[in-house]
């Protein structure tokens, strides 16, 4: 079972990512378990779940994507990380500690 976390304060964007993965992905829907989070705080509360893939919004109220990933990597170094952003501005922390697999731009 592939555990995929989607951490974004925009519910519509979370649904969009799920839809793309379900319709275009290589795994069938019964091989995927989605976990949705509205904030970095919520994701960190579930840190005991070792997600395989994490889609992380860069800009959220409270803990932003960078701060969340810095803390999350203490629990889960192996997860594949994809940063999602409306603007492309990676920081040294997000690159070095987060070690993202990809940055993807949100539709504006």
Regions found by a protein language model. Give the residues of each.
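Active-site residues of response regulator receiver
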Residues: 8, 57
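Acidic, metal-coordinating helix/loop segments flanking the phosphotransfer/catalytic sites
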Residues: 33-53
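Acidic catalytic/metal-coordinating carboxylates
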Residues: 39, 64-67
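Conserved phosphotransfer cores of two-component systems
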Residues: 47-50, 72-78, 98
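A short, hydrophobic beta-strand element within the central beta-sheet of small alpha/beta folds
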Residues: 54, 78-89
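The feature encodes the CheY-like receiver
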Residues: 61
């Amino acid at each position: 079972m592939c555990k995929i976390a989607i951490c974004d304060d925009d519910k519509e964007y979370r649904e969009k990512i799920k839809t793309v993965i379900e319709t275009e992905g290589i795994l069938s829907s019964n091989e995927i378990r989605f976990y949705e989070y509205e904030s970095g705080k919520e994701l960190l509360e579930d840190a005991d779940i070792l997600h395989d893939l994490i889609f992380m919004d860069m800009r959220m109220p409270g803990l932003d994507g960078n701060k969340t990933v810095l803390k999350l990597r203490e629990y889960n170094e192996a997860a594949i990380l994809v940063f999602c952003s409306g603007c492309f501005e990676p920081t040294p922390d997000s690159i070095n500690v987060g070690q993202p697999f990809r940055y993807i731009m949100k539709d504006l």
